[in-house]
């Protein structure tokens, strides 16, 4: 069976991930006119720039959908977002600022839940708006086939017939108007935006040029913290975790995790927390640039890692970062539910996250400027009295430290001999700007 269909399968049911925007609206109407039987599926991901989800399926029916469903994906999305925080599943960082993989998390949820809904309706052909140059076409492909082994893929944007007729936004708008729908193109922004409850992605158009900065972006989850005319008073916030799960913000608990994430977004968003500018490597190994918002994810991540560093030992923290980066890359590639990702997730959640219980108090200022004011946990292995610089009882004595330092003589001697060997091999050259002349002198004295 051919998995990818290059031309419209007339007479067959086709499920389309329907956003209500111009592209998917024109595609749905065009497919119906060409003889297909389109079914529309809209994911409610808590998009901050969408205020009427119920209207989207109604529009799909007007454009010719055989049926249209709104699938509430918010609970699952937040669950996956919390799992990513617990695992540190983030691999793109620039200058200490993190991209929280919010789009890949959204695709993992959308790709599985929408295809599952299609399967219930007997729809085994799926289309969406992803282009052939991006990451999403592969993410949706993988998640779709994981959910339904019989799935076939039809994308209007890979169909030359569709492209020849409706290859641009102007043509699509004219097509909608000609068919009796007064669908005017929205005002063109200098970039495109994709969002869900966890974060927003701004990319393409002017943002493809590196001399266009964050200053051209209008945040949809936060504020323009770079604009000095925007007043942003400092704010203290306390985040509580229990066994790796965020349970309270400023002492307030929530009926469900969706409400908790919305409040975290509101708190972080008031300051522009979690906004970053990243150059990343797409799945096809070409570089792209995006500006990201994730105020709630950033707030929870900061508090989580503060507790992590106070609770776990050095090697565990190192493995958390190493495995988290691996897992973040798998998530980015659309492999969040692959066996290698599940293995990493299980270990990080079982042995690391389960011990993260406590509270962290932060002072948020502008953008990513914050201070940690207090850290409280019964699980802390950080104990001030163990290494206090003040006089008092100590867990070890000066003689103990002398013995420990003496043991270091073995590896110091080994390192010195290696440096001599490197110098003799010409790999190191003595220079007045380095300590190597002294090493040579020591070698001569040893002779």
Curated annotation (Swiss-Prot):
NCBIfam families from the UniProt entry: argG, PRK05370.1
Highest taxon above the source species: Bacteria
PANTHER family: ARGININOSUCCINATE SYNTHASE
Cellular component terms (Gene Ontology): cytoplasm
Keywords linked to the UniProt accession: Amino-acid biosynthesis, Arginine biosynthesis, ATP-binding, Cytoplasm, Ligase, Nucleotide-binding
Residues engaged in binding ATP: 17-25, 43, 129, 131, 136, 194
Lineage: Bacteria, Pseudomonadati, Pseudomonadota, Gammaproteobacteria, Enterobacterales
EC number: 6.3.4.5
Protein name: Argininosuccinate synthase
Gene3D superfamilies documented for this protein: 1.10.287.400, Argininosuccinate synthetase, chain A, domain 2, HUPs
Annotated GO MF terms: argininosuccinate synthase activity; ATP binding; protein homodimerization activity
UniProt-annotated location(s): Cytoplasm
Binding site for L-citrulline: 99, 135, 139, 192, 201, 203, 280
């Amino acid at each position: 069976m051919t998995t990818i269909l290059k031309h419209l399968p007339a007479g067959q049911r086709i499920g389309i991930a329907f956003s209500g925007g111009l592209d998917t609206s024109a595609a749905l109407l065009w497919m119906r006119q060409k003889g297909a039987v389109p079914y529309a599926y809209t994911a409610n991901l808590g998009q901050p720039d969408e205020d009427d989800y119920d209207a989207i399926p109604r529009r799909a029916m007007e454009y010719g959908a055989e049926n249209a469903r709104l699938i509430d994906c918010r609970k699952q999305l937040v669950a996956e977002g919390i799992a990513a925080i617990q695992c540190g599943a983030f691999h793109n960082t620039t200058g200490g600022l993190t991209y929280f993989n919010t789009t890949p998390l959204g695709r993992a949820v959308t790709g599985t839940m929408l295809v599952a809904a299609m399967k219930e309706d007997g729809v085994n052909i799926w289309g969406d708006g992803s282009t052939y140059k991006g990451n999403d076409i592969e993410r949706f492909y993988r998640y779709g086939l994981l959910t339904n082994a019989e799935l076939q893929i039809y994308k209007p944007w890979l169909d030359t017939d569709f492209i020849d007729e409706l290859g641009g936004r102007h043509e699509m708008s004219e097509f909608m108007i000609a068919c009796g729908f007064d669908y005017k193109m929205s005002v063109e922004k200098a970039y495109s935006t994709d969002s869900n409850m966890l974060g927003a992605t701004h990319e393409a158009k002017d943002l493809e040029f590196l001399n266009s900065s964050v200053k051209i972006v209008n945040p949809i989850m936060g504020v323009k913290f770079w604009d000095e005319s925007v007043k942003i008073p400092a704010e203290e916030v306390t985040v509580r975790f229990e066994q790796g799960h965020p349970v309270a913000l400023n002492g307030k608990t929530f009926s469900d995790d969706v409400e908790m994430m919305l409040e975290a977004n509101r708190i972080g968003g008031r300051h522009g927390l979690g906004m970053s500018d990243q150059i990343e490597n797409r799945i096809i190994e070409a570089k792209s640039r995006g500006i990201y918002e994730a105020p709630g994810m950033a707030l929870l991540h900061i508090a989580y890692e503060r507790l992590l560093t106070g609770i776990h030992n050095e090697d565990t923290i190192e493995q958390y970062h190493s495995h988290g980066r691996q897992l973040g890359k798998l998530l980015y590639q659309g492999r969040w539910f692959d066996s290698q990702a599940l293995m990493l997730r299980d270990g990080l959640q079982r042995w690391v996250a389960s011990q993260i219980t406590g509270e962290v108090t932060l002072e948020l200022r502008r953008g990513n400027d914050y201070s940690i004011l207090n850290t409280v946990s019964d699980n802390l292995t950080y104990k001030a009295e163990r290494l206090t610089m003040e006089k008092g009882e100590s867990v070890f004595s000066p003689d103990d430290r002398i013995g420990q330092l003496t043991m270091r003589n073995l590896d110091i001697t080994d390192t010195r001999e290696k440096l001599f060997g490197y110098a003799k091999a010409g790999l190191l050259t003595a220079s007045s700007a380095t300590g190597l002349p002294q090493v040579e002198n020591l070698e001569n004295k040893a002779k």
